[in-house]
C-alpha cells in the first residue's frame, strides 16, 4: 500500500482516538435522494458528490432491477464499516494480517412491524497473529465502527472470526447479550 495512504489512515485513527466523549462537534452526514421511476432512486452523498448510487427493487417486487435494494445497501454498509475499522487498525498497528473475504448475513422478519433479529459478519483473515491479538483487534474495530455501535443498541450483532481458514472466535453484542 502506498505510504501516503498509510499515513492518512494512521492519522485518522490517532485523531479519532483523541475525540472526547461525548463528541462536542458531532458530524452530520447528508445524502440527497432523487426518485427516478417507480421504486428506482439515485442517491448522491453531499460530501462525495462524484458518486451516484442507484437503489431499486427487483422486478418481482415492483422495481426496475437497476440497482441493489435498500436492504442490500444497508447490510453492505454495516459490514464494510466494520471491515474498514479492522483494516485501519491493522495498518496502524502494523499487525501482519490480511482479509481474504467477508460475508454479511441479516436475519429479519418480513412481517409488517418486523425487523432485524441478528446481523452476522463473518470475517476471514490470514496472518501470523495470536487469538489474543485478534480479539484485541476485534474489540477495537467494533468500538471504532459507528454503525456497529449504533446497531448493537437495538439488534444482536455477531462477529465470526476465521483465521487461516479456521473458525477461532464468536463475538456478540447487543440488547440480548
PLM regions and their residue ranges:
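Extended beta-strand/beta-hairpin segments
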Residues: 1-73, 88-177
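Compact, glycine-rich, soluble single-domain proteins
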Residues: 75-83
Amino acid at each position: 500500500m502506498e505510504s501516503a495512504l498509510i499515513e492518512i489512515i494512521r492519522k485518522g485513527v490517532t485523531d479519532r482516538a483523541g475525540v472526547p466523549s461525548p463528541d462536542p462537534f458531532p458530524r452530520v452526514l447528508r445524502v440527497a435522494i432523487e426518485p427516478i421511476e417507480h421504486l428506482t432512486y439515485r442517491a448522491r452523498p453531499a460530501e462525495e458528490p462524484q458518486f451516484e448510487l442507484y437503489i431499486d427493487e427487483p422486478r418481482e417486487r415492483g422495481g426496475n432491477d437497476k440497482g441493489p435494494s435498500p436492504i442490500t445497501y444497508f447490510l453492505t454498509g454495516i459490514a464494510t464499516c466494520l471491515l474498514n475499522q479492522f483494516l485501519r487498525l491493522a495498518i496502524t498497528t502494523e499487525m501482519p494480517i490480511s482479509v481474504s473475504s467477508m460475508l454479511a448475513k441479516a436475519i429479519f422478519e418480513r412481517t409488517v412491524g418486523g425487523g432485524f433479529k441478528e446481523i452476522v459478519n463473518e470475517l476471514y483473515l490470514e496472518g501470523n497473529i495470536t487469538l489474543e491479538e485478534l480479539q484485541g483487534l476485534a474489540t477495537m474495530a467494533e468500538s471504532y465502527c459507528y454503525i456497529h455501535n449504533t446497531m448493537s443498541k437495538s439488534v444482536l450483532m455477531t462477529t465470526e472470526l476465521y483465521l487461516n481458514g479456521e473458525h477461532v472466535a464468536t463475538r456478540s453484542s447487543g440488547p440480548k447479550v
